[in-house]
Amino acid sequence: MVREEIAVATGAPRWKCVESRIDSKRLYYSRFILSPLMKGQADMIGIAMRRALLGEIEGTCITRVKSEKVPHEFSTIVGIEESVHEIVMNLKEIVLRSNLYGTLDASICIRGPRYVTAQDIILPPSVEIVDATQHIANLTERVDLCIKLQIERDRGYSMKTPHNDEDGSYPIDAIFMPVRNANHSVHSYGNGNEKQEILFIEIWTNGSLTPKEALYEASRNLIDLFIPFLHAEEREIHLEDNANGVPLALFTFHDEFAITNIRKNKKKMALKSIFIDQSELPSKTYNCLKKSNIHTLLDLLNNSQEDLLKIEHFCMEDVKRILDILQKHFGFDLPKNGK
């Protein structure tokens, strides 16, 4: 087993990039550390940062395609290898870079025979193509491909109703997230009361921004969310005079069953957010669990001791170590069998 040595900062916590690479024009990767942190802080920051990276950063996408000569999305055009639906799906994958808001227009107008790629899109000056080689269509004959595009900037997902409007336009399910994936893990070091933590964060982006830019953007968004608390002032509020009030349903003791279900769901969501690589498991135990598709604390708690012993290369010593960690950090236990 190869152990990695990381230079740990002293004093105030500091960020550092320990690994960075470009796998392709549409896949950037970086790994960062934040240290030193007090016990419990790394997990708290890691969970918040991961959610901000995946859900709070904005991206630019093609959200609508318009072609007056096409009767419906699943039709074909003579002289074009792909169906209209396949062309729309290819346009959905185009990665764009822009800082402007609102709806922007773009277009493609090409005559075959030739391949049509992202570089053939006529864009406004404020929008850039990340990978000009992305395939759109193959015109096999002397035919024209003329389509209009709508570009928007947003965050998260935008699910569109699968239908074409009367003007011949087709909405696209857009994925605005420039961060493809983000993981975090925690490493503890030190002894006794002086135990501290290092937070590791891995970020993969689609090339429209670098992982470092994504980390900065996510951090800024989190800070913006907390700023109102820094300026909060206690003052008497008369709810009956508030014209902007929102009616809230009051819980009564008759809603005890509903409250219990809400608590269970919150607990389940929390367990899903805790990954086993955040625990103090040896690499051998961790790898065995990963191969058995056990990735989170919730996955682990859905197994009994008997189930774990069925995992290849797993022994009773591994199970005991897991039981100790569950009891020590979470107050949980595993049943001996699945009955």
Swiss-Prot record:
Positions of transmembrane segments: none
Superkingdom field: Eukaryota
EC number: 2.7.7.6
Molecular functions per Gene Ontology: DNA binding; DNA-directed RNA polymerase activity; protein dimerization activity
Keyword Magnesium recorded: no
Region described as Alpha N-terminal domain (alpha-NTD): 1-233
Cellular component GO terms held in the UniProt record: chloroplast; DNA-directed RNA polymerase complex; mitochondrion
Family matches, as NCBIfam families: rpoA
Name assigned to this protein: DNA-directed RNA polymerase subunit alpha
Organism: Piper cenocladum (Ant piper)
SS bond partners: none
Pfam families the UniProt entry points to: RNA_pol_A_bac, RNA_pol_A_CTD, RNA_pol_L
Domain remark from Swiss-Prot or TrEMBL: The N-terminal domain is essential for RNAP assembly and basal transcription, whereas the C-terminal domain is involved in interaction with transcriptional regulators and with upstream promoter elements.
Protein's cellular compartments: Plastid, Chloroplast
Catalytic reactions on record: RNA(n) + a ribonucleoside 5'-triphosphate = RNA(n+1) + diphosphate
